[in-house]
Amino acid sequence: MAPISVILVTDHKLPEAMSTTREKLLATTSKFVSTFGSFDVDEILAIRTPTCLYHQCCPSFNKNVVTNEETRANFPQFIATFRRFDFSILEPDHTLVDEASRRVMIRAKASAESIVGAYENEYIFILKMTEDCRLVDEIYEFYDTIRLKDLQHRLEAKHISYGDTAPFETRTTQF
């Protein structure tokens, strides 16, 4: 992994090339975030490369790697579980951008209405972009597992499986 470059800017202006790369990375990140509540799997996948891998990285859950095809196949479960899913960046000023490696890290929150009531969670996402910064090539997701477990328990109480307990195949993520 390339080291993160830091530029000390005293006049509040970034060099032209750095600004353009940074702006592209942030624009793609913004698109990624805006697709979460769209309930449109085509829109969600349009921001990703065809080979994008989605790493769900929480040790107390199975560490899954999900492909675009698996996302598409499992999307009906998401639609059936949530009536509304609002997703946004928390503290945008704390978003980390590594222009050299084309990575962005955000802290985000979800506020949703599920078929078993309210659901809220917080996330850390690390997005690895393509060289031109226009598509997401890899996603690393970390989330509050206690809140997700609570949702799963409420779903299980109604005999509904979701997430790691749902019947779909995934692969284990390697760090």
Curated annotation (Swiss-Prot):
Transmembrane segments: none
Gene3D superfamilies per UniProt: 3.10.450.50
PANTHER family referenced in this protein's UniProt entry, alphabetically: AUSTINOID BIOSYNTHESIS CLUSTERS PROTEIN F-RELATED, AUSTINOL SYNTHESIS PROTEIN F-RELATED
Protein's name in the database: Austinoid biosynthesis cluster protein F
Functional summary from the UniProt entry: Part of the gene cluster that mediates the biosynthesis of calidodehydroaustin, a fungal meroterpenoid. The first step of the pathway is the synthesis of 3,5-dimethylorsellinic acid by the polyketide synthase ausA. 3,5-dimethylorsellinic acid is then prenylated by the polyprenyl transferase ausN. Further epoxidation by the FAD-dependent monooxygenase ausM and cyclization by the probable terpene cyclase ausL lead to the formation of protoaustinoid A.
Note: In A.calidoustus, the austinoid gene cluster lies on a contiguous DNA region, while clusters from E.nidulans and P.brasilianum are split in their respective genomes. Genetic rearrangements provoked variability among the clusters and E.nidulans produces the least number of austionoid derivatives with the end products austinol and dehydroaustinol, while P.brasilianum can produce until acetoxydehydroaustin, and A.calidoustus produces the highest number of identified derivatives.
Alphabetized InterPro entries for the sequence: Fungal_Meroterpenoid_Isomerase, NTF2-like_dom_sf
Pathways involved: Secondary metabolite biosynthesis; terpenoid biosynthesis
Source organism of the structure: Aspergillus calidoustus
Similarity remark: Belongs to the trt14 isomerase family.
Top-rank taxon: Eukaryota
Gene Ontology annotations of biological process type: terpenoid biosynthetic process
Oligomeric and partner information: Homodimer.
